[in-house]
């Protein structure tokens, strides 16, 4: 997972909602899930089942595959605190993982080319080792 969202709880996505001109959590969740989420679904809490289906951190279990993570510390699109939900889920379920931080990168990992090279090399090792 490279710069990808770990969870889609709408409260965490205010910047993206603003950028995409989404006025409500229902609009955001409808866009992310492909399901027509209404304000009533949100108020009832039923929206959680849809968020559960698309949020990597919520899908992790003891049978999850080893995971390689990389996040840019200057990412303006994916809230960086979300990575902790995924890391915690992996640790709580005993899933092997490696984590890379790209200190100079935003959503694309092109400002830390040495780190990107290490990440890509390890991704090939993951393919050989686990798949």
Locate each region found by the language model:
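C-terminal catalytic histidine-bearing segment of alpha/beta-hydrolase fold enzymes
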Residues: 68-70, 84-131
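Active-site nucleophile loop of the alpha/beta-hydrolase fold
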Residues: 1-9
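Mobile cap/lid helix-loop segments that gate and shape the active-site cleft of serine hydrolases
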Residues: 12-59
